[in-house]
């Protein structure tokens, strides 16, 4: 399954890049889930993120590797791919991209590809992930 999100924000490219840290990661967790951040290296190629997440009392491991990252004067992006995923996920690839619109605004886009143990689960999770 594929998801795509896009938003315009009033911040510079560097300001947005600086905000991609542990604090932001924890703020973005869904309210109904528990999340423990065990390791956060950053957003550059070769970095890793290790999580324990799920419903309270039922945490599962999620390990993502940053498999690609690049920056130019007008764009910054990185890709995280799930290496250890909680059930029911079997595949996860998330491309984070920030493009400069002006000195004070950028477009942030997220392209997510994921797979589950069945097509039915893919479709059922599409709504909550969206």
What are these model-derived regions, one by one?
Residues 6-8, 20, 76-82, 108-113:
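A general secondary-structure boundary signal
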Residues 15-17, 28, 59-61, 88-90, ...:
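Short acidic, gly/pro-rich beta-turn/loop elements at beta-sheet edges
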Residues 2-4, 59-65, 90-95:
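Short, surface-exposed coil-to-beta transition loops
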Residues 81-130:
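Beta-strand/loop substructures that line and gate deep hydrophobic ligand-binding cavities in soluble
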Residues 1-48:
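Hydrophobic ligand-binding cavity/cleft-lining segments
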């Amino acid at each position: 399954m594929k998801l795509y999100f896009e938003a315009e924000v009033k911040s510079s490219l560097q300001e947005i890049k600086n905000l991609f840290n542990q604090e932001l990661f924890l703020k973005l967790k869904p309210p109904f889930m528990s999340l423990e951040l065990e390791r956060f290296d950053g957003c550059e190629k070769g970095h890793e993120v290790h999580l324990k997440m799920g419903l309270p009392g039922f945490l599962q491991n999620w390990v993502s590797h940053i498999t690609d990252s690049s920056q130019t004067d007008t764009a910054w992006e990185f890709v995280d791919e799930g290496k250890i995923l909680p059930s029911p996920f079997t595949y996860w690839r998330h491309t984070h991209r920030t493009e400069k619109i002006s000195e004070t605004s950028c477009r942030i886009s997220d392209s997510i590809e994921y797979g589950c143990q069945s097509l039915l689960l893919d479709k059922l999770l599409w709504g909550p992930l969206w």
